[in-house]
Amino acid sequence: VGAAVYCEDGRIFAGANVENASYGLTVCAERVAILRAVSEGVRRIQAMVVVTRDGGTPCGACRQVLAEFADEDVWVWCYGEDKQEGQEYRLSDLLPNAFSLRSRVLQEEEITLGGT
């Protein structure tokens, strides 16, 4: 699996799947690309491209990590190894009602304001 993210400042960061004998420690290409960008100071991701054997979409963990650094309407393009055309998705379609620290803070403010 390979992935790349396009960032708000125009930079592109690529990532590859990093396998581990202990499967739970494997890191997906999408998260590698996102974390490379974040480690270089990027805070907002504008788009993501993923290439898998069959054109599959990012796993739930990768979707959640992307949601922390992208708006819900960010495009995610998924391609298979041998296909010329990919599928395009909005993050909000892949992860509706995503949890984020921002959404949690807003919920807490609403609860506080609603109770006064």
What are these model-predicted stretches?
Residues 6, 35-41:
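Alpha-helix C-terminal capping segments
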Residues 11-12:
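Hydrophobic "anchor" residues
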Residues 1-7:
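Short beta-strand scaffold segments in enzyme catalytic cores
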Residues 40-116:
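C-terminal binding/interaction regions
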Residues 5, 15, 48-51:
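Short glycine-rich or small-residue beta-strand-to-loop segments that form or flank ligand, phosphate
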Residues 17-31:
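Compact, glycine-rich, soluble single-domain proteins
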